[in-house]
Structure formats: structure tokens, C-alpha cells
Amino acid sequence: MLPTFRFAAILAVTLFASLAFGEHTSNWAVLVGTSRFWFNYRHMANVLAMYRTVKRLGIPDSQIILMLPDDMACNPRNTFPGTVYSNSNRAMDLYGDNIEVDYRGYEVTVENFIRLLTDRVGDEMPRSKRLLTDERSNILVYMTGHGGNEFLKFQDAEEIGAWDLADAFQQMWEKKRFVDRF
């Protein structure tokens, strides 16, 4: 298993173990792959592995926001078209037929991510692209990509800083959009 996948699995199990003892009405996951291009295949595999994990632990697609650059499965360099695997033995196709991508390609931006978290999206935005949480919701936010000390790159075009993320979480707290976040 990939070290990142192990970490993701441990994080997801910890999340749901903690939820078993608390009052809650809804569990949500926001899963973000921030890297494009073939040489970042591993980042798409990471976020899809986390997607499968949270689904297996009981979060329905209606409560998972999946943000993917979505260009690896159909990339001409992919020797197994339409598939994404996390290891060389190809034991499990992570892409499969049952994934629901909410934000894809150039929709995966810092602005859209912050708007999603803080509920600053227009009324025309479909429910599938909204984080419909409240003060009793638990939220897992998982992001994978390239970054450095206090920042993460989005598609090699822009960056989100630690302070931007902290500010978004503070706004979410003030708007009573979660009870706990992971």
C-alpha cells in the first residue's frame, strides 16, 4: 500500500471511530486532488483511494464532494485506458463506473474550494456541488497534491495558503457549518 493511502485509511477509520461516540446527524467528505497532468497520476490515485474508503465506511455520494482534475484515466499515456490504479498489481480499479465527480478539470480552483467550504456559491449551483452541512455535521477534508511549508498548489496555476484555509474553517465555524472537522 502507498504510505499516503495508509495515512488516509487510518484518518478515515479514526474519523468514524470518533463519530460513534458523539451526537451527529451527518458525515461529509470533501476530497480534493489539486494536481493535473500525467506525471501527477499518484495524486489522483490517492484521492480516489480515499473516496473508496469513505464510501465503504458509509458516507453516500450525496455527502461526498469530489474535486478531480480528471485527466489521468483517459490520458493517451495510460496503458489501461479508463482506469486508475494505486499500485502496480492493478488489484482494484479506483476509477471504475461508480464515481461521482462534482468538480472536474478547470473547476478545481482555490476560489471554488473556498466558496464550497464557506457556502458562498450562487443559487444556480446544483445540490451536488454544495456542502449542505449544519452545526451537527462532521466534515473530513482531504487534499492531495504538491505544496510546501504552509501552502498547497492547485493545478500549477495558483496556491492556497494555510491562513486561507484557517480563515475558511473559521468562517465555517461562525456559520455553524460543522461540529467537528478532520
Regions from the language model: what does each represent?
Residues 2-136:
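Boundary/activation segment at the start of structured domains
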Residues 28, 138-140, 181:
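Structural motif
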Residues 124, 148-182:
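Cysteine protease catalytic core and zymogen-processing segment of caspase-like enzymes
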Residues 135-153:
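Active-site microenvironments of hydrolase-like enzyme catalytic domains
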